[in-house]
Amino acid sequence: MSNIYDSANELSRGLRGLPEYKAVKAAKDAIAADAEASKIFTEYLAFQEEIQKLAQTGQMPDASFQAKMEGFGKQIQGNSLLSEFFTKQQQLAIYLSDIEKIVFEPVSELLK
């Protein structure tokens, strides 16, 4: 039987070899090369972190967070580099979701 860590590392290498992964990486590199897109992206990630902290403490985002989220949505849709990145990221997420189901299937079986 192969070492489970070797299998995980092989999976990691396989993900990096996917065309969808490479497309996300190229889109992220394009964002990094554009000052406006990079600024919006960095601010968006910081905002996402704020929301995660709220969720971890059991707090709900208020109306100002909703307004800020809508603002980011408009900025992202209005920037072709950012909208391309998130589109490509969604395509990669399909693989990640499928892999998650496969990996957690044995754990799920234990809970039945």
UniProtKB/Swiss-Prot annotation:
Gene3D superfamilies according to UniProt: YheA/YmcA-like (1.20.1500.10)
SUPFAM superfamilies: YheA/YmcA-like (SSF158622)
InterPro entries reported in the protein's UniProt record: Com_YlbF (IPR010368), YheA/YmcA-like_dom_sf (IPR023378)
Family as reported in the entry's similarity comment: Belongs to the UPF0342 family.
HAMAP family: UPF0342
Name of the protein described by the UniProt record: UPF0342 protein SPD_1206
Source species: Streptococcus pneumoniae serotype 2 (strain D39 / NCTC 7466)
